[in-house]
């Protein structure tokens, strides 16, 4: 039994992730478990999951399940293919699909985190392959060129400045 005291976020990258012996989530599912939720996790044949711990306040109570493989969950924002995952006053999390030579640009006053689910990004001479994690602090400009077909990113913004403020309050 897993207890998600501070809340967790999971993205199934491969295999099948099972919850409570009855709910199977294949690759592409996004799961958001609120503060103090309980569930039993397993996988019959194994699963690779991207997990972020301590992602929610005790005030967030909604469990979220999104199949990111379902086209109905994707929208076009300008020239961007976006799968919104979660949005609040202090967080915006989404997946973004990009084409080769496309530029991923994000100007975030509050910081940004990027996980490369598939494909590859490049910034100058630096190459970021699948599985790379990029965190830019508040007031930094994200500007990356897409190098490969089928590049998909997990992107989280609007949260780092708020997290830093909470950290400072707790440590004062």
Question: At which residue positions do the language-model features occur?
Answer:
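Glycine- and acidic-residue-biased ligand/ion/polar-headgroup-sensing regions
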Residues: 1-20, 108-124, 130
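Histidine-centered metal-chelating micro-motifs
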Residues: 3, 18, 30-41, 103-104, ...
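Short, structured motif recognition centered on aromatic/hydrophobic residues
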Residues: 10-17, 25, 29-32, 49, ...
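Glycine-centered loop/turn motifs
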Residues: 22, 26-28, 101, 126, ...
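Ligand-binding loop in jelly-roll beta-barrel domains
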Residues: 22-24, 35-60, 127, 138-167
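A short, N-terminal "cap"/entry segment at the start of jelly-roll beta-barrel domains
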Residues: 46-90, 94, 169-172
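Surface-exposed interaction/gating patches
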Residues: 73-123
